[in-house]
Amino acid sequence: EIGVEWVILGHSERRQYFGETDETVNLKMLQVLNNGMTPIVCVGESLEEYEAGKTHDVVKTQVVAAFKDVTAEAAERVVIAYEPIWAIGTGKTATNEIAEDVCGYIRGVVAELYGQDVAEKVRIQYGGSVKPATLKALLEQPNIDGALVGGASLQVESYVAMIEALND
């Protein structure tokens, strides 16, 4: 009714400060889809999970839970943002290789759930400390369709620099 088109779900800060769970993310996703909006579902692992080699397990659990009871037709409208928690607001960022590996793995999980055609239609973004200097190379990765930009989007100079980097 008020023109909202996109809704971010499962952001790490919502999970940390408000106790949002995989189950509540799923319930919200179903509501967002049923109301004609596009969900951007955030998934990602903590530093401890990353260092323990559990990244794939963590994101698979989050993706499978988020898509529970979502039809293939609705799944095509979903955006998934991989945001490694250890990279948010820390100045650390996953290498392009790590980001591509995890985003490709996420696409594979969607393919397991719905088939390759749906997986190719789902947009997958990277959202861990995206900066102008790293954006263009990140978006050249085959399984990264965009970026979920946080803090850098709050500074005009940084945001303009990102746009300019894409135009180079």
Report residues per predicted region:
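Active-site loop-to-helix "anion-binding N-cap" substructures in soluble metabolic enzymes
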Residues: E1-D168
